[in-house]
């Protein structure tokens, strides 16, 4: 009996990681707000995401590591260039899936 596991598919691993990152309701609300197109500071995102600024800072680090958001001048956060929303916002094309961010988590 061969018990060796097949090598994991790299895109499947990325999707699994993204699913883990996006599973958090605060991160979902942050992405939904950023999908509207504005670059925002942590304190504004904290209010919009109904969380504290220190917690949102930690969430932003996770989203940055996943490549979903970028930080610019003045520590303003926005969606990473590859994930800019379509006109009207609330929709992000991640390549292997499209997120509709117009729903509450």
What kind of feature is each model-predicted range?
Residues 67:
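Glycine-centered, phosphate/nucleic-acid-interacting loop/turn motifs that mediate DNA/RNA or nucleotide
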Residues 70-71:
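Short beta-strand "wing" residues that participate in macromolecule-binding interfaces
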Residues 36, 78-105:
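Conserved segment of winged-helix/HTH DNA-binding domains
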Residues 64:
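Helix-to-catalytic-loop junction in kinase catalytic cores
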Residues 60-61:
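Short, hydrophobic-biased segments on the C-terminal half of alpha helices
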Residues 1-13:
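Long, low-complexity, charged/polar intrinsically disordered regions in eukaryotic proteins
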Residues 13-21, 25-54, 75-84:
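N-terminal helix-turn-helix DNA-binding core of bacterial DNA-binding proteins
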């Amino acid at each position: 009996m061969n018990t060796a596991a097949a090598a994991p598919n790299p895109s499947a691993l990325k999707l699994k990681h993204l699913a883990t990152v996006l599973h958090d309701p605060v991160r979902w609300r942050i992405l939904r707000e950023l999908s509207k197109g504005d670059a925002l500071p942590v304190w504004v995102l904290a209010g919009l995401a109904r969380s504290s600024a220190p917690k949102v800072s930690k969430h932003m680090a996770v989203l940055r590591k996943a490549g979903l958001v970028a930080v610019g001048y003045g520590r303003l956060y926005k969606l990473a260039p590859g994930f800019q929303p379509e006109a009207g916002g609330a929709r992000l094309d991640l390549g292997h899936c499209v997120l509709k961010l117009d729903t509450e988590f």
